Amino acid sequence: MSEIRLYVTTTEIKAGEILDLMSDYFGEEDVAIATTEVDEKRDIWEASVYLMAEQEEEFRERVSTLLAPAFPGLVIEKEIIPDVDWIAKSLEGLKPVRAGRFIVHGAHDRDKVQPHDLAIEIEAGQAFGTGHHGTTAGCLEMIEDVLRARKVRNALDLGTGSGVLAIAVRKMRPIPVLATDIDPIAVKVAKENVRLNGIVSGMALETAPGFHSDAFRKHGPFDLIIANILARPLIKMAPQLVTHLAPGGTVILSGILASQRWKVLSAYNGAKLSHIRTIWRNDWVTLHLRKD
């Protein structure tokens, strides 16, 4: 049964906004959505939804209805997805990414790792987060800064994806880490990446939608919570997230466009967190907040 991709071509900022909109709209439906950079110099991006071919007519109409009010004039295009090994394909030409002392790399670039590096080997393929996106790189930089400056006894990586951020915490500090994701495939991939990086203890991985799991009560409250998701769900979950944060605890938030920064800050200031620092990477921001 063939798979297709419906996509629109736009700018990086609009692609992020479209991704945010589609994530909120499609929720837990059995479709995948993504943004892809096509041409960095000309700021050309694609926002895509992946589905089975027989769903095309229904989803074309739904996507058109969803996007038309805010993004008039966008043309929905189609690509038939060939039957290839996407994990291998995703790693072709993938260059190592440096963020502070961290270097995120594939197996083909192990020789690029230097003795002082905190190396994270990721074969993401099926899950978001190889370090190449500004949100992931910003989180890695912030994690290093926070763990250098503060005493952290345990951590939560909410929406772990490939597991790269949870692995980063364990690479810097031998503390217990809980990593969760709504997607069981992401959790499976994260477990493989954890094993690949030689982490044999101190890491719990769970499939959990939001905070609806006993794992949060079992492992929390947390001195550090990392959530690299999207602005809308981050805003909605602010009151819940703060209840799982230990007194004096730290939060790192990303997946946020620069234009959404104040809305997210407002939600977390309202939940009694203080803003400490913002890292800017292109049009994306990573926020550091603290519970007083």
Curated annotation (Swiss-Prot):
List the Gene3D superfamilies hit by this protein, alphabetically: Vaccinia Virus protein VP39
Q: Where does S-adenosyl-L-methionine bind?
A: 136, 159, 181, 228
Catalytic reactions of this protein = L-lysyl-[protein] + 3 S-adenosyl-L-methionine = N(6),N(6),N(6)-trimethyl-L-lysyl-[protein] + 3 S-adenosyl-L-homocysteine + 3 H(+)
Does the keyword tRNA-binding belong to this entry? no
| One term of GO molecular function | protein-lysine N-methyltransferase activity
Q: Report the EC code(s) recorded for this entry.
A: 2.1.1.-
Principal cellular location given in the protein's record:
cytoplasm
Task: Identify the GO cellular component terms for this protein.
Answer: cytoplasm
| Record's keyword terms, sorted | Cytoplasm, Methyltransferase, S-adenosyl-L-methionine, Transferase
Q: Where in the cell is it found?
A: Cytoplasm
Q: Name one GO biological process term.
A: methylation
InterPro entries from the UniProt entry: Ribosomal_L11_MeTrfase_PrmA, Ribosomal_PrmA_MeTrfase, SAM-dependent_MTases_sf
Any Pfam family hit: PrmA
Q: Which family does it belong to?
A: Belongs to the methyltransferase superfamily. PrmA family.
What this chain does, per the entry, is described as: Methylates ribosomal protein L11.
Record protein name field: Ribosomal protein L11 methyltransferase
What's the source species for this entry? Agrobacterium fabrum (strain C58 / ATCC 33970) (Agrobacterium tumefaciens (strain C58))
Lineage of the source organism? Bacteria, Pseudomonadati, Pseudomonadota, Alphaproteobacteria, Hyphomicrobiales
Please state the gene responsible for encoding this protein. prmA
